[in-house]
Each structure stands twice: as C-alpha cells, then as structure tokens.
Design a protein with these regions (language model features):
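Generic beta-strand structural signal
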Residues: 55, 81-83, 95-99, 106-114, ...
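RNA pseudouridine synthases
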Residues: 62, 111, 115-121, 125-141
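A generic local secondary-structure boundary/capping motif
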Residues: 47-48, 72-74, 99-108, 122-129, ...
C-alpha cells in the first residue's frame, strides 16, 4: 500500500469505474482530483472505503469512559487483554452512504473510531517496532444494534455485522502526516448537535500494543484495518438522522440512517 505521494487519498466510483482521488481544496470533499487528472464534484461520485480493505479487526471496550457508560447495562470484566472481534466485508460502506436501521430495533448507536490501516505484513512484531507497519488512518463509524447484545465478550453477529454498518472514510491519511495518533480529538454530531466528544489519548490498549497482541497469533497484511474503539457518548439514532463523525487531522465522515423501505425489503 503506497500513500507516499499524497498525504490524503480516497477511492470513488465515477463514470463506471473505480478511481483513486485526492482533495482539490485542502481536506474538503467538495471537489476531487482523480488519478487521471480529471476534476469532479462530490455530488457526481459514490464514495467507497478509501483503500482496498482486507481483514476488519474491531476492538470493544477500549476507552475507560465507554466501559463505565456500558457497565450500567451489562457486567464488564477485566481489560487485561484486548477484546477483539472480526467483521465481514459486506458491513463496509463509504462516506455519504446510507446505513439501515432495521424495523423493530429499540437501540442502534454510532461509534466514532480511529481506524488504523496496516501497510505491510506483521507477524510476531514487538510494540517498539509496530508503528512501522502502519500505512495510515481513516475515520470509522462502527454501528451497533444493542438489542442483540447479551455478552460483550461474545458479541452477537447481529450487533456488529450488519450490511452497511461499518462506515469508513472519506480519506486515508498517510501515517507520516499524523505525528501522534494518540492525541486526536473524536467528535460525533447527530442532526447537527454535538453528542460525543473524546480523545484517542484515553485508549486502554494503544496502537503499538494492539499490533503486538494481534500479530502474536495472526499475520496482519497490508490493507487490514484495526478499529480501535469509541469513547463515551453514544445515543440511539433513528431513520432520517444524519450522523457526522470527525477526527482531528483525519477527516469528517457523513452518514445517513434509513429504513427498510429504501432497500425494498
């Protein structure tokens, strides 16, 4: 994976093909420059996840304040070891995409997360060397349907593997452009109201430790992505809501909540 030429890149569908794209105006998504030199408007493209995604590895309960928030509902145990789980490829969508709220659901919430993108193979990597395996970062909004959550340590597939429930983008930001990924502010707005606010400084298990842990029992490949968890401040979202998740220096990710009727079933 090579992001060296541009600190900020995207992938979009335009005119029947998939293109790499960069912003024409700083970090704005309003107009894009395609790899072939054409300039296009955001309204004319479909945003995809900003890189070819391999394995999707997600963290649960990786912010202490979020643990306290959820412990009011369920028993949460020790965090000596990261709580990790895998997500399916059909859960992925890009910036400005639509996420379905299933009929009859009582509680579905967003999760603003820093997504760490692996740039080269990692197996048996020590924490001190782990950051050399990171290509870059993007924003993730990792939805959860809490109705089906019975045990945080055995996440039900219906909670975290819904089609279109893992929103990535808009940009892949080169690791060299992010001096300290543990000093970033995360924010979420629902219909223009700021609801969630936190900092990556409060991760329980930091990125080098996560890469060391994961690579101790599995090989991480270029394109794999590690979703590092969310801080406190999650609330229910409903059909018609606009959800915006933002991480300083990484991007501002827009997503829309829709009902079953939009999908024809």
């Amino acid at each position: 994976m090579n992001t060296a030429r541009n600190a900020r890149t995207a992938r979009v569908a335009y005119s029947g093909a998939i293109h790499s794209a960069t912003p024409l105006d700083g970090g704005s998504t309003a107009r894009l420059r395609l790899a072939d030199g054409r300039s296009v408007a955001e309204a004319d493209v479909v945003w995809l996840p900003p890189f070819a995604v391999g394995s999707i590895i997600a963290l649960g309960l990786n912010y202490a304040d979020h643990v306290k928030e959820l412990a009011k509902e369920l028993t949460v145990g020790s965090q000596d070891e990261p709580l990790v789980f895998l997500k399916g490829p059909n859960s992925l969508i890009g910036h400005q995409g639509a996420t379905r709220r299933p009929a009859g659901v009582a509680f579905m919430h967003y999760e603003c997360e820093l997504a760490v993108v692996i740039g080269r193979s990692a197996k048996g990597v020590q924490a001190a060397d782990a950051m050399a395996h990171v290509a870059g970062y993007t924003v993730c909004n990792d939805y959860a349907v809490r109705d089906h959550l019975e045990n945080w340590y055995r996440p039900n597939l219906r909670v975290k593997n819904r089609d279109g429930g893992t929103v990535l983008g808009p940009w892949l930001v080169d690791a060299a452009a992010v001096p300290d990924p543990h000093a970033l502010q995360l924010r979420t707005w629902v219909n223009g109201k700021l609801i969630q606010q936190g900092s990556t400084a409060h991760m329980v298990h930091r990125i080098p430790a996560l890469i060391e842990y994961l690579s101790s029992f599995m090989t991480l490949q270029a394109g794999d992505v590690v979703l590092t968890g969310t801080p406190e401040g999650v609330v229910n979202v409903d059909e018609g809501d606009e959800v915006v998740t933002e991480i300083d220096g990484i991007g501002r990710l827009v997503n829309h909540i829709v009902g079953d009727a939009v999908f024809g079933r």
